[in-house]
Structure formats: C-alpha cells, structure tokens
C-alpha cells in the first residue's frame, strides 16, 4: 500500500524543487553565495510558503547577510515561480534561515566535550572502564 500525501505536502515538494532551480539559475547576486533549500512549509490555503535555507558562506559573508540579500529577491523569485507552476495562486515566499544543522553540530560538539571530560577525569582518578568492570566481578 502506498503512502498518501496531502496536497500541501505535494505542493511543498514541488515548490522546493522549483525554488532550488530558480535560485540556482535566475538569481544572480554575489552576496548570496551558495544556497540550499532544506524545507518548504506551505500554509493550508497555499497562500504562503515558508522556505528554510542554509548557506555556504564565503569570505566575510555571514548567514545573516546572505539572508538579507536573499530577502531582497523575494518578489522576483515569486514572479519566476508563478511562471513555472500551474496553480491558481502563487504562494507568497518568505525565506527563513534554517539553523538545525548548526545547532546539531553544536550539540554534537557539546556531547563530545562532556565525554572527553569524563574520560579525562576517570584517567586522573586512576580508574578506567576496564578496572571498574574487573572490580564488579
């Protein structure tokens, strides 16, 4: 049995593909850098699309400066999107920075740091996992 997707999910996937092509081929702005669309959330009435993006920033670029430059292109991107998709209403596009990758890396680093601190403290006290398991037997 195949999975059923709602109309908003199908439209969201289509918008993600089309927006990626538009940003790659039609938006020419050196301030933006390399953009990846990680997700698109569409409102139930298909009037609004919240586009989550990440950036590969080069040099002095920051995600905030890239996002500000990208937001200047919201109207032209919506117009290009309207030419590509066959919907009665072209959704209003809102770009939002997706920090889940950055937060995930930060959390991973924190966990690694805690594990390394714990290992260092065990070595300083003269106990390791092997000596603990031998003492328990």
Curated annotation (Swiss-Prot):
GO terms for molecular function: ribosomal small subunit binding. InterPro entries: KH_dom-like_a/b, RbfA, RbfA_dom_sf. GO terms for biological process: maturation of SSU-rRNA. Coiled coil: none annotated. It comes from the Bacteria. Signal peptide: none annotated. It is found in: Cytoplasm. Keywords: Cytoplasm, Ribosome biogenesis. GO terms for cellular component: cytosol. Residues 113-137 are annotated as: Disordered. It holds the Pfam family RBFA. Residues 116-137 have a biased composition (Basic and acidic residues). Monomer. Binds 30S ribosomal subunits, but not 50S ribosomal subunits or 70S ribosomes. One of several proteins that assist in the late maturation steps of the functional core of the 30S ribosomal subunit. Associates with free 30S ribosomal subunits (but not with 30S subunits that are part of 70S ribosomes or polysomes). Required for efficient processing of 16S rRNA. May interact with the 5'-terminal helix region of 16S rRNA. Belongs to the RbfA family. HAMAP family: RbfA. NCBIfam families: rbfA. This is Ribosome-binding factor A. It comes from Vibrio atlanticus (strain LGP32). The gene is rbfA.
């Amino acid at each position: 049995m195949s999975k059923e997707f709602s109309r908003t999910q199908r439209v969201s996937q289509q918008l993600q593909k089309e927006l990626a092509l538009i940003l790659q081929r039609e938006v020419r702005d050196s301030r933006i850098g390399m953009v990846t669309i990680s997700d698109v959330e569409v409102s139930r009435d298909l009037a609004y699309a919240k586009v989550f993006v990440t950036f590969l920033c080069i040099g002095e670029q920051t995600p905030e400066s890239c996002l500000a430059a990208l937001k200047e292109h919201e109207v032209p991107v919506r117009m290009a999107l309207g030419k590509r998709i066959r919907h009665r209403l072209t959704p209003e596009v809102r770009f939002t920075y997706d920090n889940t990758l950055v937060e995930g890396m930060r959390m991973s680093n924190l966990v690694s740091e805690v594990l390394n601190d714990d290992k260092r403290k065990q070595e300083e006290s003269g106990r390791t996992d092997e000596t603990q398991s031998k003492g328990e037997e």
